[in-house]
Structures are given as C-alpha cells and as structure tokens.
Design a protein with these regions (language model features):
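Loop-to-helix entry region of an early transmembrane alpha helix in multi-pass inner-membrane enzymes
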Residues: 55, 59, 67-89, 93-94, ...
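Short helix- or helix-capping micro-motifs
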Residues: 119-127, 181, 185
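Extracytoplasmic catalytic/substrate-binding loops of multi-pass membrane glycan-assembly enzymes
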Residues: 27-39, 49-60, 74, 142, ...
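TPR/TPR-like (Sel1-like) alpha-helical repeat modules
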Residues: 817, 830-857
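ER/secretory pathway lumenal C-terminal domains and tails of membrane proteins involved
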Residues: 104, 132, 137-148, 160-176, ...
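Register position in tetratricopeptide repeats
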Residues: 733, 767-768, 801-802, 835, ...
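Transmembrane-helix motifs of polytopic, lipid-linked glycan transferases
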Residues: 13, 78-108, 150-157, 418-423
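TPR/Sel1-like alpha-solenoid repeat signature
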Residues: 724-727, 731, 743, 758-765, ...
C-alpha cells in the first residue's frame, strides 16, 4: 500500500512538473484582453472588480504581485499556471481512485499499471485541452482557481471521505469540503456546483451524514441569489434539522418553539422584505445559534453542525473585504459596495439584470449546439481539422447535405469522445456510486448550466469557459475509457504485446493534442492588448476623457493606468457602466473628475436606467449622460474644460458623429463641424511614430504570423487598418494619389487576406492608370477568397475596362452563383454587354434580376426602355469601414 501511494505521489508530481513547464513556456507575457486586465489592475491596487467582486482572488493576486519575479501581469498570469498544473495533478489522483474503484480490491499488478495509464491520460488530456490550457496561461479567476482547482479538490475530498467512512465513520473531509466551498465563493461560484455531487455521494453512503451536511451544501446552491436568500435557506434548513433533533429529545421543546418563532421572522425578512433590518437579522441569527449551541453541548452531531456553520461563516467572511475596501474609494470600485444595499446588489449581480430559466433567450437547438456542443467538440482535437471543415463547407454550399453531415462529425476529437462514453458505461457497470458521483458533477456543469445560464443566440464572446467543469468531468471518464480499452485488449488478445501497444498509443493522445493546439495557445510575444491600450491612450490631450464601450477597450486601459501609471490624467468613461448611479457618482467625485453637474438625488433617479429627454422621449441613462458630460465640458469658455474623445470601438455616437475628427484609434469631439473628419498630422504621427504593434505587425508593417491572434484580437486590430484607409482617402481627396496608394499598400501588407482593404486598393490602382496591377491584385484575390462575390465582381469590372468582355462575364457569373442577390454583378454584366453592343444578352441579365427582384425600380425601368446605364461603383466612394468588434 505504501509503495502504491508513493508511486501515485511521484506520478502526480511528474504531471505537475510537465504541465507547469508547458504553461510557463506559453504564459502570456503581459495583459490579455477580456477580464484579465481588470483582475490584474484590481490585484495590484486592491480594487473591486465587476460583480460579484471576487474578493479572495484579489487578495491572492495582491500577494502574487509582491513576489519579485518578472512583471506584475506575469506574476498574476502565473497564478493561473500554477493552480492549473496542481489541478492536473489532482485530476490524475482522482482518476486513479476512480479506476481502482472500477477494478475493485482484487486487482492485479497489470490492472494497477493500467489504472495509472488511464488516470495519466485523462489528466494530460485535461491539461492540454482547448479551454483549460487557454485559461491556464492568463489571469483568469473563473477557471484555474475558482472552478477547476476547487472542484477537483472537493471531488478528491469526497472520495477520501467515502474511503475513510467505510473503515470508520468520520466527518473531517466533509467539514473541509464545507470550508473549501465557502471560501472559494470569494473567487467564483463554480466551487459551489460541487455541492450537488457531494450531496449525492453522502446521501448514498450515509443518509444521516447527508441530513447533517444538508444546510451548508444546499445553501451553497442559492448563493447567486444574494445574502438574504442565503440567510433564509440557512434558517429553513437549520430549523428542519432542529425539529428532527427536538423529536429525539436533544433540544428543549420550548427552545424549539422560540427558535421557530424567530425563524419565521427571519424567513419573512429574508424572502419578503427588501432589506434586513438590524432587529430581524438579530432574531434570525439567534433562531439558528441558540438551538445549535444547545445541540452542540449534548451530541456529536450538534458539534459537527456547529463547526460546519462556523466554517461556512469563516469561508464567506472574505466578502467583508468588499465594503471595507469600497469605503476607501479605490480607483477601480465596481458597484461601490460601501453600503448594505449596494453590497447586496453586487452579490446578487443586479447590474446584469434578472436571470430566468424561462422564457428561453434562444432556441434549445441554438443553446445545445452553438453554445455547448460547438465548444465541447473542440476540446480534444488530436490533429488539425481545418481541411475537413473546409470540405464540409463546400459540400454544404453545393447542397450535398449528407457529406456535409459526415464532415460535421468531430473526427479530430472522435477518439477521446468515444473513450469518454466507454468510460462512463464501464464505470456505471462496475461502481454505481462512483458513476452517480461523477455523473452528477458532469450533469450540473453541462445540462444544469445550459438551463441556468440561458444563453442568447448573440453572446458577445465564446462562452466555452462556463462549461470547463463539464470538460473536466468528461476527462475523468476518458481516463476510465482508456483503462477499460487496455483491459479489454488484454483480455481478448493472445499476444502480450498488443495491450502494451494499445496503452502506448492511448497514452500518446495528450502529445498529439498538445502538438495540435500549441500555436493557438502559445502567448509568447503577444502584447496585442497591452499595445492596443497604449495606442489608444498615448495621443490623447492632457486631462481629457475618452468614452469606451466594453471590456476590451476598457480593462486594458485600466491596467495601463493603474499598474503602469500611464496617462493617469485621462479618465476612461465606460458607456456600459454609465447606466449606473454609483459609476456616475465616481466620475463626478473621484479624480480625474469628469464635468458632471448633478446632485446625488438626480443621479439616483438616473440609476433607474432610462430618463426623459428635452422632447419627453425616454432615452437610456448613458445617452443622457454622454450629452450632459460633453455639454458640461464646453460651458463658460471658448475651449473645452476637458477634451472629450470616443474610442473607435464605440458603435453608438449619440448624435456627435458630425463633430468627430479621427485621431488614430479615437475620435476627437470638436465644438463644431468645421474641423473635418480626419486630422492628418495627428493620425499619421500616431500611426508611424507613437503606436506600438508588438505581436501584430513586423518591423516592415506586415502581419506577424509567428504570434497567434484570436478572432477578437484580429478584429480589434483592423481599427489600425481603418485609420490607414481614412488617411488614404484623405490623400486621394487632396490629389495625392501616390501617398494614398502607399497607405493602401501598407494596409494590404498588414492584412493580406482582408478583402475590404484589397478591393479599394485595386480601385486606387485603376484611378492611377495601373490596370495591370489592379488585374493582378483581383486575380489573386479570387484565388485567395474563392467564396467572396465582391472579389469576382471587382475582377470582372477591371477585365471589362480592359476590354476582355467574355472573361469579365465569367467573373460576373461566378459572383452571381455565389450570391444570387448581389445586384452589382447583374448590373456589371449588363453594363459590359450594353457598352459592347450586345443589347439582347445585356437585357437577359436584367430580366434574370427582375424575375427574382420585381420591386427594383431601376431594373424595371431598364427593362421597359431597353436601354440605360446602371449605377457603377467608384473608388471615390467613402472607404468601407472594417467590421467592428462585438463588445459587451
């Protein structure tokens, strides 16, 4: 037994070492996008991040910032790496216990080694899975600490309690579970999901213990409802347990009657009053503590219950950080939980609105496939599946739905997925209790979350991280499936070498997985978020303010200001938060202040979300506040009190767009509309002399292929292209076509596959008289973008200009084939044929178009007259704006 324990410990240590090395090699060197910027900044300054405040993570992060190692963001990012590596090691140990339970006590030496191989494979497949690896190398509170580490520790403690309980009844591991769950709520609620599996396990093994621990475990499930509902749950569950012990004579009946009266008062205050009063809170507390104290003096069960209640309170006490720190007004103080009402609102996440199971915000098909299965299937690709996906897209476009369905099968991850199913079936047959334990964990972290979270079909970002616990549980089943397959091979095969070969092949899966996902999970050299924030702040006027939209144009800026002390004179005004009263008060009162001339009562009214404007129409609070702030900035002087800006990522401009002048990544708001839409000097200086592009572009301005950029980073980076495009069109309007072409060519180097840039560049070549360059560009574009109808249309138009009508028609026909509603292709074909005297063929295209679009007045007029010239796009039109990122 000692040798087995030593072997398991050594293998677990090896798992930790290997995984930690990989994570530290691929660790993000600076601030990433999304929540990481906020968490790094809050850890550094002891701030309060977005609801529910995650106080324990901030405190742990603050300790990490004090370690003299590399930079502050690397220290916080390393927290995720360390805890994720520990999680992988614990996953191996849990998997080993589960496989041993499946084999039974009478397993032989080969089965013991099979258990090690299965557990090791499952743990490493978790470590190098898509979502787990991605969150392990960035400052992320949800996954590494608050969910995966806490959950696998709780899962292990539950198994440890079960193992010890069979020898001698004990409550120690369960009491530790209570503390771990309740303290980890200060990081994320994910740890609380383990309450259900623990209830299932304890109820199966020992019903008396289940009744004893029902209060701390069940109460954990209502934590998202806030303090009052939690208090109500504690009162109800405790009262029910006290009644049981009263009937057994362990609690005085009169004490129970008094406790029941107090419990009724407490429940009414918890569930029906808007806030606790001091009196009702005291009565509710007494209704629980007095009977519990009496019970603790008379029985072991009472002492266990009292200790569990104490551990709940101690664990949850990390939330006391929130009002204490909020009262000191840190620079980042989301929700400002300095009062009871605001603290409760923060813990209940009222800022995000009420969450309901029904009605569903999207169809079940969307929620199951797009918001779950799409993420689940991409966790364990053993080889790149891009070729299969592209082939499936071609089959679907060609109407071959059968082959498209075949391509939709997750071939790259098929082996791990099938092994997980096999492991689940094998565990269900061999040990029903362990199956229900792991299965309930998987169920609540997949189906339960789908029901609870109720995602819409337009989520602002990939939500794969919410289901990380489900992937985790499934990896345990994959490990079981590996052990089952090796054992079955051993049982059925005559040759001893066959199960060895199978074991080696299965154990190699994590290596193939790591190889497949290495590039997309290697953050070395990735400074995109850091430099994007720097580039937005650097050119701003002193003591100005900038309106931003969501996480990715706000949190990195907060990081730059609070951690690197860069441009702290600038106030970042987040439009999403500008709908809340506490944020408006902070903008008014905390430096650097924003011009706001409203008292507290007026601001509280604005906090309701809508306000009537001058015409009596209701508008959103943030729209009202933007106008109020800008108007307050220009009162009493010919110049701005503070210069306002809008980030280019802001989609709604509140009517100020005519007064915008582009300056790099921001729009400067002018006092009138006379300044023009572009400041060429400022923008050019910013683009060429100020901005940093590490990880985005190489020294020659071309796209850096060595650093992976996800869809969000790639989309945000196109705002640099937008600035260059505006410069190019500015030069064209000034008659400086050569400089305009130079700008366009620079953008083409920056984004070689961005058709919204390449097509206008071809137009610039045409205007410059360089038809050969335009033809070469468009021909290459049709090869690189074979499904883009605009590429074929542009190529056809250029061929027609050259006089190659028949070849031009082939391009127009291809554009029509790709997009039957693309009117420009029809008109282009008509124009070419009509100009070359082929009127009948020209009218054929118009008839074809009118058949499908009878309401097109221009086409009908051409059809009736038999002649005419259609509209023709010109490169002198306004430049197309690159797609803007979808920010929350």
């Amino acid at each position: 037994m000692l040798n087995r324990a030593r072997t398991a410990a050594l293998v677990a240590l090896g798992v930790y070492a290997v995984v930690a090395v990989v994570y530290f090699i691929t660790l993000a060197p600076s601030v990433p996008f999304w929540d990481a910027g906020e968490f790094i900044a809050c850890s550094y300054i002891l701030g309060i991040p977005h609801p529910p405040g995650t106080p324990l993570y901030v405190l742990i992060g603050r300790v990490a910032t004090l370690i003299p190692w590399h930079t502050v963001p690397e220290r916080i990012n390393a927290l995720s790496a360390v805890f994720s590596a520990i999680t992988a090691a614990l996953t191996y140990l849990v998997g080993l216990k589960l496989i041993r339970l499946a084999f039974g006590e009478k397993r032989d030496a080969l089965q013991e080694w099979t258990a090690h191989i299965g557990a090791l494979t499952g743990a490493l497949l978790l470590a190098f899975s898509d979502t787990f690896w991605e969150n392990a190398i960035e400052a992320e509170h949800v996954h590494p600490l608050g969910m995966s580490f806490a959950q696998i520790l709780l899962l292990w403690l539950g198994l440890r309690w079960w193992e010890e309980h069979e020898r001698r009844p004990t409550a120690g591991p369960l009491l530790l579970c209570v503390y771990v769950m309740w303290v980890c709520v200060g990081i994320h609620l994910g740890a609380g999901m383990m309450a259900l599996p623990l209830i299932v396990l304890v109820a199966i093994v020992d019903r008396r213990a289940a009744a004893l621990f029902a209060m701390p475990f069940v109460t954990m499930l209502v934590v998202p409802k806030g303090l009052q509902v939690m208090a109500g749950a504690v009162i109800l569950l405790s009262t029910a347990l006290f009644l049981y012990y009263t009937l057994q004579g362990k609690i005085n009946r009169w004490v129970m009657v008094a406790s029941a009266v107090g419990a009724a008062i407490g429940v009414k205050a918890a569930f029906y009053d808007e806030t606790f009063t001091a009196h009702s809170a005291l009565v509710a507390f007494a209704s629980v503590v007095i009977p519990m104290t009496m019970l603790a003096r008379r029985s072991r069960e009472g002492r266990i219950l009292a200790l569990a209640f104490f551990l709940m309170a101690v664990g949850y006490s990390t939330h006391a950080y929130l009002p204490i720190r909020a009262a000191q007004h840190p620079a980042i103080n989301e929700g400002d939980p300095s009062t009871w009402a605001r603290l409760n609102a923060l813990l209940e996440r009222q800022q995000y609105g009420q969450m309901h199971f029904f009605p569903r915000r999207a169809s079940w098909g969307v929620q199951l496939h797009k918001e779950f299965w799409r993420y689940f299937r991409r966790q364990w690709p053993l080889f790149p599946s891009g070729g299969i996906d592209a082939w499936g897209a071609r089959m679907a476009a060609g109407g071959n739905w059968l082959l498209a369905r075949v391509a939709a099968i997750p071939w790259a991850a098929l082996l791990p997925l099938l092994l997980g199913l096999a492991g689940a079936v094998w565990q269900a047959r061999r040990n029903r209790t362990a199956f229900l334990y792991v299965g309930s964990f998987l169920a609540i972290s997949t189906a339960g979350l789908i029901l609870f979270l109720n995602f819409s079909d337009h989520e602002v970002r990939d939500r794969d991280y919410f289901f990380a616990s489900g992937y985790h549980a499934y990896c345990l089943w994959i490990g079981l499936g590996v052990a089952w397959l090796i054992e079955e091979t051993r049982r059925l095969s005559v040759q001893r070498a066959v199960p060895v070969v199978v074991a080696v092949a299965l154990l190699s899966q994590p290596l193939w997985l790591a190889r497949t996902l290495w590039f997309t999970h290697d953050r070395r050299g990735n400074y995109v978020a850091h430099d994007y924030a720097y580039d937005m702040l650097a050119p701003l006027a002193p003591n100005s303010y900038v309106f931003t939209n969501g996480d990715n144009d706000t949190f990195p800026l907060w990081y730059m200001q609070e951690v690197e002390n860069f441009r702290q004179d600038v106030r970042v005004v987040n439009l999403s938060l500008l709908n809340t009263d506490w944020y408006i008060q902070q903008l008014r009162d905390d430096p650097p202040r924003v011009p706001i001339h409203l008292d507290d009562d007026a601001i509280r009214m604005l906090g309701q979300g809508e306000v009537p404007d001058a015409s009596g129409h209701y508008i959103l609070t943030n729209e009202y506040m933007v106008k109020h702030i800008i108007e307050s900035s220009e009162q009493g002087t010919r110049n701005w009190v503070k210069q306002p800006y809008f980030a280019v990522t802001v989609p709604e401009h509140m009517g100020f767009q005519p007064r915008f002048t582009l300056e790099g990544l921001v729009y400067r708001v002018n006092r009138d509309t006379l300044q023009g839409d572009l400041d060429e000097k400022v923008t050019r200086h910013a683009l060429y002399d100020v901005f940093k592009y590490r990880g985005l572009f190489l020294a020659d301005g071309s796209w850096d292929p060595g650093v992976y950029k996800d869809e969000n980073a790639a989309t945000l980076s196109r705002n640099f292209a937008a600035a260059h495009l505006q410069l190019a069109y500015y030069y064209r309007r000034q008659g400086k076509l050569d400089r305009g072409i130079a700008e366009m060519e620079r953008v083409a180097r920056m984004f070689p596959d961005f058709t919204d840039v390449l097509i206008p560049l071809g137009g610039f070549y045409m205007d410059h008289g360089d038809t050969a360059k335009a033809l070469a560009l468009f021909e290459k574009l049709t090869v690189n973008a074979p499904n883009d109808p605009e590429a074929f249309y542009s190529y056809g138009l250029t061929l027609a200009f050259k006089g190659d009508i028949e070849k031009a028609l082939k391009q127009f026909d291809r554009a029509i084939e790709l997009e039957p509603n693309y009117s420009q292709a029809f008109y282009g074909a008509y124009y070419c044929l009509n100009q070359s005297g082929q009127h009948d063929r020209a009218m054929g295209y118009i008839r074809h178009w009118v058949d499908g679009h009878p309401n097109d007045a221009q086409a009908r007029a051409l059809l009736e007259s038999g002649r005419g010239v259609p509209r023709r796009p010109s490169s002198s039109q306004a430049p197309p704006r690159p797609p803007q990122p979808n920010l929350p």
